[in-house]
Amino acid sequence: MKKLLLGDEAIAQGALDAGLSGVYAYPGTPSTEITEYIQQSPLAKERGVHSRWSTNEKTAMEAALGMSYMGKRALVCMKHVGLNVCADPFVNSAMTGTNGGIIVLVADDPSMHSSQDEQDSRFYGKFAMIPTLEPSNQQEAYDMMAEAYDMSEKLQLPVLMRVTTRMAHSRAVVQCADAPRQQNELNYNAKASNWVLLPAFARKRNDIVTAQQPLLEQMAVDSKYNQYIDGKNQQMGVIASGIAYNYLMECFPNGCPFPVLKISQYPIPKKLIRRMTDDCEFVLIAEEGQPFIEDQVRGVMPGNAVIKGRLTGELPRTGELNPDLIKKALGMEIGENYAPCEDVAPRPPALCQGCGHRDVYQALNEVLLNYPNARVFGDIGCYTLGFLPPYKAIHSCVDMGASITMAKGASDAGQWPAVAIIGDSTFTHSGMTGLLDAVNENADITVIISDNLTTAMTGGQDSAGTNKFEAICRGLGVSEEHLKVVVPLPKNMAEIKETIEQEINYHGVSVIIPRRECMQTLQRHLKQKKAAEKK
């Protein structure tokens, strides 16, 4: 059966057809569509596949470990910075091993289209000593899922699959299986000595995983996804990984004249690389992200070949690749006999018309006119756009949950007033522990939890704390007297400003919750309601 699928959708369909029992994820571009596809899949509903959003990536990874412990196949999805959040269980999952297969799907974002950095997740796979896959097209993304699950169960290791933005968000026709594999049965074969990571047991597992590394490398050498393609002109060779291989092939519609080593499975296949460095005078390494392969080739490969790539300037050190960049690196002429597209009028990002965050920033800015030394610590979400004109309201945005802890640290340093602004989903993701720290030390900060009843930035997914924030804050020790809820509307501006003024001047932890539904989800709900009424 053929389907036209996004890269993310091909991954999701591949997981379902491979006998998936549960997907665990926190939404983050460019990975969000994987979980959404599974949530909407008739096959997933028929089979009872667990597909709910997790509070954060760490809880997602740990839940997947629990499913694997019981012998079922699990998928964990996140964007690249989410892998930092779940690094503890991710790395330790190599020590526990797997019972049912686990695939950790990480979507990297070269050029930082919607992220605060462009870190390369392949380093995590190497660090954790587990197999890593990087599809070069949507068909490979689909096919790799079944093979990755088999690999995970055979090796008793999780498998990391890395995709990038262009792979995740481009479409292609994918040949899918006619019939999906059956889901694993529940089993109790997990050995307690593997899963209880006391030092005595963990040392043994560490030795086992270390001893597996030559096998993983040989599997990469033998993998059908790592191909050595001979070329007539051996002056230059090209090593291309993931989607960069597609860009290379686009440069040569009639076939590349140089030897090409396509890499889509790691650890790097040293035998194949050695063949190229022995045969070729120059080797260009084309890879999305950091010079992961290039660093290793320079460090461990013998041979006389001159290595070129991101570290030598033939390719840009940062940002995405494209066919023109690869042509230039190969010394080819870049065609200019085409009419360029007309410049698109600039459309800077902005908070939506009618968004409750706008009213919050308007009130906050007006109050802080009386406090010229005030500092507002922001967080990750739609409200980060409050940094831009016309509000220019926040002074920092580092990572999920940092607003509260940075405000506390600034207060510890003597800053007043110190205000944190954080969204509802980000608060439950990683803000609660920071608030607990602040309460325990009676920090002099004001926390604004801007609650729009959804995870708006990534498309309106459910927020774990909806209708629970007052109870959560009370449970963390916030005083009832200094826990306020307001409705961010222009007509309520006087009340909102008065509340902010009062809580800033309270010397302790205070929390303000401006609550109003996201305009985008509100419009969607109204459309759904009208459609239902017509039936």
Task: Indicate residue ranges for each PLM-predicted region.
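Short, acidic loop-beta-alpha module within alpha/beta folds
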Residues: 71, 233-258, 401, 405-407, ...
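Short acidic, glycine/serine/threonine-rich loops at helix termini
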Residues: 34-37, 63-65, 86-90, 112-119, ...
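Thiamine diphosphate
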Residues: 1-138, 164-166, 231, 257, 387-511, 517-532, ...
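Flexible, low-complexity linker and terminal segments
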Residues: 1-12, 18, 135-351, 356-357, ...
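A glycine-rich helix N-cap at a beta->alpha junction
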Residues: 45-54, 96-107, 185-193, 440-453, ...
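Short beta-strand segments
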Residues: 77-78, 103-107, 160-164, 239-240, ...
